[in-house]
Amino acid sequence: MSQYDNVSVVKKANVYFDGKCVSHTVVLADGTKKTVGVILPSSLTFNTGAPEIMEGVGGSCRVKLKGESEWKTYGDGQSFNVPGNSSFEIACDEPYHYVCHFG
């Protein structure tokens, strides 16, 4: 799916790491919340509250989940799962566009 129809968008952006990650929250008709964003070239560490599925929709990244020793590469059309109350490191050499699915 290349777009979401019939959604509400929170106008104010979520800006993290001095602008290296910017996203917008979208709310689907059924109340489901997602964020749609971009991570600019950088190496960042994110903490999670709820479980997340990160769906890549453009670019690529390397990811290391908390407790793992190896980095894995993900690109356009690929997803990775992050447990709740955890963290992950992400490294991008190019803009990485994503949709974050919660729960």
Swiss-Prot record:
Annotated protein name in UniProt: Pyrimidine/purine nucleoside phosphorylase
Family listed: Belongs to the nucleoside phosphorylase PpnP family.
Reported function: Catalyzes the phosphorolysis of diverse nucleosides, yielding D-ribose 1-phosphate and the respective free bases. Can use uridine, adenosine, guanosine, cytidine, thymidine, inosine and xanthosine as substrates. Also catalyzes the reverse reactions.
GO molecular function: guanosine phosphorylase activity; purine-nucleoside phosphorylase activity; thymidine phosphorylase activity; uridine phosphorylase activity
Gene source species: Dechloromonas aromatica (strain RCB)
InterPro entries: Ppnp, RmlC-like_jellyroll, RmlC_Cupin_sf
EC number(s) on file: 2.4.2.1, 2.4.2.2
GO CC terms, sorted: cytosol
Pfam family, one: Ppnp
HAMAP family cross-referenced by the UniProt entry: Nucleos_phosphorylase_PpnP
Top-rank lineage group of the source organism: Bacteria
UniProt keywords, alphabetically: Glycosyltransferase, Transferase
Catalytic reaction equation(s): a purine D-ribonucleoside + phosphate = a purine nucleobase + alpha-D-ribose 1-phosphate; adenosine + phosphate = alpha-D-ribose 1-phosphate + adenine; cytidine + phosphate = cytosine + alpha-D-ribose 1-phosphate; guanosine + phosphate = alpha-D-ribose 1-phosphate + guanine
